[in-house]
Amino acid sequence: MALPNQQTVDYPSFKLVIVGDGGTGKTTFVKRHLTGEFEKKYEPTIGVEVHPLDFFTNCGKIRFYCWDTAGQEKFGGLRDGYYIHGQCAIIMFDVTARLTYKNVPTWHRDLCRVCENIPIVLCGNKVDVKNRQVKAKQVTFHRKKNLQYYEISAKSNYNFEKPFLYLARKLAGDQNLHFVETPALAPPEVHIDIADQQKNEAELLQAAAQPLPDDDDDIFE
């Protein structure tokens, strides 16, 4: 159910649901946006925190009401009330934990069962960590389902804005939309090796040109 205070702003606002296994960094990611963290509200009936994240675009201000599960996914699936009226979504996994990627199809299925035809971004978090278990070339689910994929590092703010910009463009139907101002973000807690990450991004591009494997299970053999 949409929050009573959700449509009080006089500029476009959207419900953004963030899903993925516990411990993948969803809460850390949302809390990087300082204004949203300051203005968050708890919705006890569903057990979620809702963070209002504002972004400034060349077409004006927009707001994402980011629904964060507050860790309840660790105790079973999420209730439909979490997904209902969702207008866009982020599915997050942890590149240092293989199982969190293997569970992405389940999250995608649960999401699409309630929210049909909404823009979805897949995010591989924690790319700042050295012992990566899910290599860039092994991430293929987004290609099978026509999702956008970004490698991110919540703790270093790496690529923080990209999922939001992609979703904003999709929701506005305007590929030329861009952010004109950086939101206030928490200072980086870690630093990412940009040279290393550029190699990963290059690997992603190369993988995109290859035929898809028949089954995701094959990629971890």
From Swiss-Prot:
Keyword Iron found: no
Keyword Oxidoreductase among UniProt keywords: no
Function description: GTP-binding protein involved in nucleocytoplasmic transport. Required for the import of protein into the nucleus and also for RNA export. Involved in chromatin condensation and control of cell cycle.
Any GO MF annotation of the entry: GTPase activity
InterPro entries (alphabetical): P-loop_NTPase (IPR027417), Ran_GTPase (IPR002041), Small_GTP-bd (IPR005225), Small_GTPase (IPR001806)
Oligomer and partners: Found in a nuclear export complex with RanGTP, exportin and pre-miRNA. Interacts with RANBP1A and RANBP1B. Interacts with TRN1. Interacts with ATX1. Interacts with KPNB1. Binds to XPO1. Interacts with MOS14. Binds to NTF2B.
Protein name: GTP-binding nuclear protein Ran-1
Induction of its expression: Regulated by light.
GO terms for cellular component: apoplast; cytosol; Golgi apparatus; nucleus; plant-type cell wall; plasma membrane; plastid
Small GTPase Ran-type domain residues: 10-174
Organism of provenance: Arabidopsis thaliana (Mouse-ear cress)
